[in-house]
Amino acid sequence: MLTAVCGSLGSQHTDAPHASPPRLDLQPLQTYQGHTSPEAGDYPSPLQPGELQSLPLGPEVDFSQGYELPGASSRVTCEDLESDSPLAPGPFSKLLQPDMSHHYESWFRPTHPGTEDGSWWDLHPGTSWMDLPHTQGALTSPGHPGALQPALGGYVGDHQLCAPPPHPHPHHLLPAAGGQHLLGPPDGAKALEAAAQESQGLDSSLDAASRPKGSRRSVPRSSGQTVCRCPNCLEAERLGAPCGPDGGKKKHLHNCHIPGCGKAYAKTSHLKAHLRWHSGDRPFVCNWLFCGKRFTRSDELQRHLQTHTGTKKFPCAVCSRVFMRSDHLAKHMKTHEGAKEEAAAAAQGEGKAGGVVEPPGGKGKREAEGSSASSN
């Protein structure tokens, strides 16, 4: 018996590859003539409502079969669900509710807004996507009386979210009688500013009047100028006398405090340069190639640079010589003055040796003067 069963299975296995595929019953395509209706005009209607119902849309599904819902005591059928819908009966009538503007509105809006606290925003197909309370001046959509009001305070609508705040004094922006716009501060603020400026000027005048005369400076000092600390200036400051060329009796007021020096200068800059000579500080350096010499004064550096450039800025007005330093030119001018004196002395000696020619009438005048002196 087992042998017969195995033989039958083997025969079926061997015959399976040689089996021919099932024959398909294909029919030729038929041309379809479109039906025209008077309502459609010149455009042909491809299908009629009766033909639409006869066309199969997919595998047939029996919607009459009931389904058991979790938590339900009895079976619920699709007919029972369709009877509750206000739309035309159909299997997809409950996919969209009549008050929903889109598929996801039920996520934001509860089904019964009167019995449940709503969220702070609401979506609806009106002109504005956000509804605000009536107490805050919002405009709600008339087509949705049950729309929830958002709990946003301080805003009057979505069109005014970016608007500037109202001016606290709108009457200041109104045009004046003369046609000018008062865009500046009000008159009260101007009056307060003027009063503050007057009080500041009065305080400064009182401070200047209460200041003692000895503490006032005859010459104003600039912000970058420092006070000289030489012995003469310190003594003058202690006595209350003005330290300067106007109030001092001596010409050289700023003296060197190094013991044994005693040099005095009329300018504080010269005294500072002299003190740098004592300390050995030479801040002015020549930047010429392979030079690098240092100097205590800036004018010394400038004169040194002229040796590199060869420029001579001080020409002599008498002769054609040019000098790099003004003191050299002054010394050279003395030679010209000495030559003039020598020439004048030589001309005077030549006149004495050759005889002096008397002007006409000179001898008679001398005789008259001599006779008048003897008679007296």
Curated annotation (Swiss-Prot):
Protein's UniProt keywords contain RNA-binding: no
Stretches annotated zinc finger (C2H2-type): 254-278, 284-308, 314-336
Keyword Metal-binding: yes
Matches recorded under InterPro entries: Znf_C2H2_sf, Znf_C2H2_type
SUPFAM superfamilies reported in the protein's UniProt record: beta-beta-alpha zinc fingers
Disrupted-gene phenotype: Develops fewer, smaller, incisors at 3 months of age in a transcription factor ASCL5/AmeloD knockout background. Epithelial cell invasion is inhibited and CDH1/E-cadherin ectopically expressed in dental epithelial cells at 3 months of age, in an ASCL5 knockout background.
Gene Ontology cellular component list: cytosol; nucleus
Keywords: DNA-binding, Metal-binding, Nucleus, Repeat, Transcription, Transcription regulation, Zinc, Zinc-finger
A Pfam family of this chain: zf-C2H2
Subcellular location: Nucleus
Low complexity bias locations: 344-360
Tissue expression as described in the entry: Ubiquitous. Preferentially expressed by proliferating epithelial cells of teeth, hair follicles and limbs.
Disordered: annotated span: 1-70, 164-224, 334-376
Entry remark concerning the domains of this protein: The 9aaTAD motif is a transactivation domain present in a large number of yeast and animal transcription factors.
Function comment: Promotes cell proliferation. Plays a role in tooth germ growth. Plays a role in the control of enamel mineralization. Binds the AMBN promoter.
UniProt protein name: Transcription factor Sp6
Lineage of the organism: Eukaryota, Metazoa, Chordata, Craniata, Vertebrata
Encoding gene per record: Sp6
